[in-house]
């Protein structure tokens, strides 16, 4: 099991009801972690319309996760 430091913004933060959490997971990749989070928080956004950053660097969704990683899922910017 991995302990992942997660940060949420915009509509993801609203859906999760928090901006930050430490989550214990067995997800091997960022994509698998997002699938897990979608099940928990009913996130509506598809990964294809967002970016993921792992340890302050943009990363592919298939990036393997390591214990202690800081993961930020960045939704599209909206507003006017």
Residue ranges and their predicted role:
Residues 1-79:
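Ubiquitin-like/PB1-type beta-grasp interaction modules and other compact soluble beta-rich domains
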């Amino acid at each position: 099991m991995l302990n992942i430091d997660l940060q949420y913004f915009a509509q993801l933060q609203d859906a999760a009801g928090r901006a930050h959490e430490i989550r214990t997971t067995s997800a091997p990749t960022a994509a698998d972690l997002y699938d897990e989070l979608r099940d928990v928080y009913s996130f509506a956004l598809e990964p294809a319309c967002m970016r993921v950053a792992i340890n302050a660097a943009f990363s592919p969704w298939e990036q393997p996760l390591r214990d202690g990683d800081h993961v930020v899922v960045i939704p599209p910017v909206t507003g006017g």
